[in-house]
């Protein structure tokens, strides 16, 4: 059976790649030096966002109130399936040690990390499914501290459904 491409993107010449890398490197360096204040400055400049960077418990509750119940039900349905599968996956992985030759040991041991950072695409196109998949999987893995980060919609902040999902 041969593969037939139904759609295929035309190759285009790379443009601006070096400029982009330079700008990003400069921004990261500025944030490293300027910390949260510099990050806030970029959020205002690039996203027209001046709100909190870390959401408060009150903002989490307010975001949940903005999400329609049907959407919450759908998110919970997906979350339960993803977490259930991840828990089964974790159970299928076993710790072991084997002596391959006298004095030569090999093995594996699962140790959850203390903190996981979950990037959730947002802004123009919010991806709630990314929050479901990354947060549920991290929690199923036994991570104690799960942090979700998502870019704000210009002038509006993070999508309420993403905030709701990250808090499950």
What spans do the regions from the language model cover?
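N-terminal Rossmann-like NAD(P)+-binding subdomain of aldehyde/semialdehyde dehydrogenases
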Residues: 1-114
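Conserved protein kinase catalytic domain
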Residues: 43, 163-166
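Conserved small-residue-rich beta-alpha loop and adjacent elements
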Residues: 98-164
């Amino acid at each position: 059976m041969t593969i037939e491409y139904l759609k295929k993107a035309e190759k285009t010449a790379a443009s601006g790649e070096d400029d982009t890398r330079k700008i990003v490197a400069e921004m990261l360096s500025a944030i490293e030096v300027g910390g949260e204040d510099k990050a806030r400055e970029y959020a205002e400049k690039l996203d027209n966002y001046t709100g909190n960077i870390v959401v408060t418990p009150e903002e989490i509750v307010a975001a949940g109130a903005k999400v329609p119940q049907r959407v919450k039900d759908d998110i919970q349905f997906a979350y339960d399936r993803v977490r259930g599968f991840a828990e089964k996956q974790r159970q299928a992985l076993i710790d072991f040690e084997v002596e391959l030759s006298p004095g030569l040991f090999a093995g594996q041991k699962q140790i959850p990390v203390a903190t996981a950072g979950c990037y959730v695409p947002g802004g123009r196109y919010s991806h709630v499914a990314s929050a479901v998949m990354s947060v549920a999987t991290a929690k199923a893995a036994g991570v104690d501290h799960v942090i979700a980060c998502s870019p704000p919609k210009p002038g509006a902040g993070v999508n309420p459904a993403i905030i709701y999902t990250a808090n499950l």
